[in-house]
């Protein structure tokens, strides 16, 4: 049973509530009508307070001068007695004066108003006492006993303070005993706040629902929305959907949440991938013409920008303009940042020019700052418009009087590095120093990265060492870049050197550093060093990823280290990493080379059980293994199975394996048949295909076939390689044949009859 319902059923137990006059006027909002001038009212207050202070408290009742002041003061506003009570300075004096005033109340012209306001001041004093509970209860009982109506302020104070002291029942009693006409929005706000803070959500929403009715006499206001929305969201009392519905109900009364709360809620929705819901909320608020500011729109614009939804961003900005919501400096930043990231730099520059200088809702002018300029300069650099970026930097310094910073120059440096203009990038570093801007680690990483990308590893090392001398230290990114660059050119010794330097510099390696080292060591087949790096990786609290496992398994397979292969597979299983098709293909190739076809079959079966279909690489590895041991029948059987039972079609590599195998056996007919099948199935032969066929041909007996194949290569635009030329030079040794070979090299047909060779034609081959 709710508190409000239980209290409602106990109302008859309060005898005082049977007085209809008390019910009707238990509380009201005083609208004092000043009857004398403000200066005269102040004079009355000062005179009364001084007289009270001079007169001993036990003589107040008998003091004729005080009695006279009561009579004369009653001609003034009832507020006089509230002010007198406040200026007494303590609860004890305030309650004594109230009791004195009550005893003399027959002399007051506006008794109820005067006593109500004086009691309000006493309640204010009581609430600030160290232990106010009993005092507040006593004052409330006095109001009931003496039939003194409470002011709205006094009512709110009692409801709030009782609630804070955990006396929610008492708060509700105060509210319930009010006349319905006195339960205005201000009082209801306090009640709702107290109920929500004490977890009585249902009771709070009963009061709120009355306020949210269409024809409500006391509708919600901005304070109502602030109280309710703050509490329900902070305490997770409602779902997002119900909060959205609640905002809509407030919106129908022309009330919007405060800008800070609404911005946070919109941001939360966007974070939860609910940008459409955020859009609907703002649209509904705009439709009902509720007062709104730019920040909530900025939150949604940021979300749309992250998703590169520029079309909807444009629509939202237009809606803002329609309802006269002025964008601010944050709006400008969001728009130009998104446009620059999407490479629409011209539009970003246009927005920048249009919005600068406009006034915001708070009266400030949108002034471009270094962040805006940096965004535009970076955008121009990213699309290669370096000259315009430099011009904007000049304008930034001279026209706008906006000082560039390290970010500004780092953007330019990155632009020049992307364009391969490394010397110009270094010149920008010198300009930084001239402007008394110290290069930072981002500067170093940008140039080192640019130099490494453009094959300037040595240059990158020199630059980095120079920067270190100037006091700019590298970080993990710097060392990662150098290590990766060294590994990419198979200079693993240097990569290990930079790894050690990184440790000396106090930089903790991350997993990517270890992966780069493992990759480099696997490429140069240094298995022992790779194992040591794996151990270091695990000591650092990291684990191998699937790519690293595959590289290591491949390395150990090449080294014929079966023990380590199985160790890696066991480790993978412990780490919860499932083998992928690359893992299985590597293992199948390994077992195939060792003629362990039982393991090959087992691996293929395991592969299917893991939900992985054999790939063209899988079939290629097995077919190659069968061919390498002369099991061509098994190889052909698997080859045909590809076309019949799997979705994988043979590619050029698989055809070449078979053609090469048959050519080695001298079975040119079978090899040529496979080549013709390639043509029929639209699988393009390559130079390896023709080289295998050429090896099988004898110039004396199969000269025409040789020339036809050479013509096919020309027609297919298949470039011969060094092996092709060596085979053909051996097969075509006569002068006429050498002329044909020269024409073949030049891309001409050779099968048709040719003119007699010039004596110098032979030398043109050299």
UniProtKB/Swiss-Prot annotation:
Spell out the family assignment given in the record's similarity comment.
Belongs to the PPR family. P subfamily.
Q: Where in the cell is it found?
A: Mitochondrion
Q: Among the entry's GO cellular component annotations, what is one? A: mitochondrion
Keyword field contains NAD = no
Predominantly, its location class is: mitochondrion
Instruction: List the InterPro entries.
Output: Mito_RNA-Proc/Resp, Pentatricopeptide_rpt, TPR-like_helical_dom_sf
PPR-type repeats, residues:
151-181, 184-218, 221-257, 258-292, 293-327, 328-358, 369-404, 405-439, 440-474, 475-509, 510-544, 545-579, 580-614, 615-650, 651-685, 686-720
Pfam families noted in UniProt:
PPR, PPR_1, PPR_2
Transit peptide feature, positions = 1-30
What keywords appear on the UniProt entry? Mitochondrion, Repeat, Transit peptide
Q: Kindly provide the name given to this protein in its UniProt entry.
A: Pentatricopeptide repeat-containing protein At3g61520, mitochondrial
